[in-house]
């Protein structure tokens, strides 16, 4: 990143590691082309994100970044200003890079919430919601659900007990939701309370340990599983839930809706219904070929 990008073209991108399977460039570049927007979206694969790296992006004319694993919590700390979700939950998946300041946003929660409302709104009413994992995605999702007014109870199950407790404390402090950290062993004994399972860890992702996070007999036909892993769509966890008759929300839906919000933040143009339909079709086709 030694030279500035073409300044007549607005340049955005994604930062994370690894990124070889990311579909974000397909999403953003396709909409730019559809809308005749003079912009490009690049891939910046890096294991380190710090102040110096942000300055490199700024010097190169990069105006905005999608942030993914493992940098979401780091991204928040590098921003000068942040939206409520980022500020409260201490994780961001979007950075806008201005001449002098960096702004952090979190569109993960909004993306997940839209997906749930579209595919399984009843799952927010009939029982408790459990989030599996306590990383950057889990933080954004937990906050958006907590402030939605749609749930009263939230469980967070993570192998990292410290971050699970932190998420629950932040949710309880900043909403009317009762949030409770829970171990996997205890969760297995309380499965009848659960209506919605949201899986946010890398387990099942291509190139990662397959999992599943929960055994097959955890699920039943009254549950909904939302595994935010989208490559592959049918993870071992999804297959286990399907076998038990649970409803499935595709992980690609969160990718779709969080990207639509990022597109709006990057371009100041609101996505329309046609953008969503076309993007969903492109994602489906791309995932079929993987």
From Swiss-Prot:
Pfam families: SDH_C, Shikimate_dh_N
BP GO annotations: amino acid biosynthetic process; aromatic amino acid family biosynthetic process; chorismate biosynthetic process; shikimate metabolic process
Pathway connected to this protein: Metabolic intermediate biosynthesis; chorismate biosynthesis; chorismate from D-erythrose 4-phosphate and phosphoenolpyruvate: step 4/7
EC number: 1.1.1.25
GO function term, MF aspect, one: NADP binding
Coiled-coil annotated residue ranges, if any: none
Keywords assigned by UniProt, alphabetized: Amino-acid biosynthesis, Aromatic amino acid biosynthesis, NADP, Oxidoreductase
Positions annotated to bind shikimate: 22-24, 68, 93, 108, 230
GO cellular component, one term: cytosol
Assembly and binders: Homodimer.
Protein's name in the database: Shikimate dehydrogenase (NADP(+))
Native species: Leptospira interrogans serogroup Icterohaemorrhagiae serovar copenhageni (strain Fiocruz L1-130)
